[in-house]
């Protein structure tokens, strides 16, 4: 079956690239930051991501009968929970998919500038650039493409329901998961710059006290958003 090339343009800030390869009697879960550099192999399926939780979710979905797209979408939504610096639903990305028949599908779901954006939105009345407005303000963010991209892939090439593939992400956001060294380091690095944003400090610390390795990080608000997307699709987010 020859499938059309998909292009759904969005444009700016956070990038995730998903590459899937068609047919893949062992399953492998790989975190790209694993302590070992030993090569991993899989003959039925393999998921590689920044998060062991996300990779495990992808394998779980494929073992339950889902195809590679179902697994990738599950992985993507879990990354929104376990890898907030780059896997979040506030960003965008690209997907390159090689199907079992050899055909290739691509999807560009990068962020898009808001419809009310103008060419001088970062300038003052004298035409000078306002420092920080394009990098550290609400005007710095584009309209996220991640949710649209993942749901488009699932609707066009997946086999499972949103509820099924999003269940691992919703569970991890609500119940929480233990923080690893890398996430704790990231949180501590950005916490000082969040001082002007109390809501961000609340989300990424314990009343201003940095998290430590092994602490359980729960995100109830994110769980609510993911549940809404699961029930309503695009309309639950945009």
Annotated model-derived regions:
Residues 1-14:
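N-terminal secretory signal peptides that target proteins for export/translocation
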Residues 14-17, 51:
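Hydrophobic alpha-helical segments, especially transmembrane helices
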Residues 16-31:
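Bacterial N-terminal signal peptides
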Residues 35-56, 60, 68-238:
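Noncatalytic scaffold domains of N-terminal-nucleophile
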